[in-house]
């Protein structure tokens, strides 16, 4: 018995799992879009943690 030699089986890996990969990519982009929409609301636009605020792209309203 040769334990170091593995036999190659024709097991499909990508074919049954492609819907999960596509769903993951779609979910990632939808969450990114929702996060960007949330960052640009009036409530969070002047938050110092907002990247646009740090870059100086937002005027402070007094």
Swiss-Prot record:
What topology does it adopt in the membrane? Single-pass membrane protein
Purpose of the protein: Mitochondrial membrane ATP synthase (F(1)F(0) ATP synthase or Complex V) produces ATP from ADP in the presence of a proton gradient across the membrane which is generated by electron transport complexes of the respiratory chain. F-type ATP synthases consist of two structural domains, F(1) - containing the extramembraneous catalytic core, and F(0) - containing the membrane proton channel, linked together by a central stalk and a peripheral stalk.
Name recorded for this polypeptide: ATP synthase subunit J, mitochondrial
Cellular component per GO? mitochondrial inner membrane; proton-transporting ATP synthase complex
Spell out where the chain crosses the membrane: 13-32
* One Pfam family, short name: ATP-synt_J
| Source organism per UniProt | Yarrowia lipolytica (strain CLIB 122 / E 150) (Yeast)
Q: Which InterPro entries match?
A: ATP_synth_F0_jsu
């Amino acid at each position: 018995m040769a334990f170091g030699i593995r036999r190659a089986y024709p097991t499909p890996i990508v074919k049954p799992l492609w819907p999960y990969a596509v769903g993951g990519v779609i979910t990632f982009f939808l969450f990114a879009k929702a996060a960007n929409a949330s960052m640009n609301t009036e409530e969070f636009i002047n938050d110092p943690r907002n990247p646009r605020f740090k870059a100086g792209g937002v005027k402070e309203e007094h």
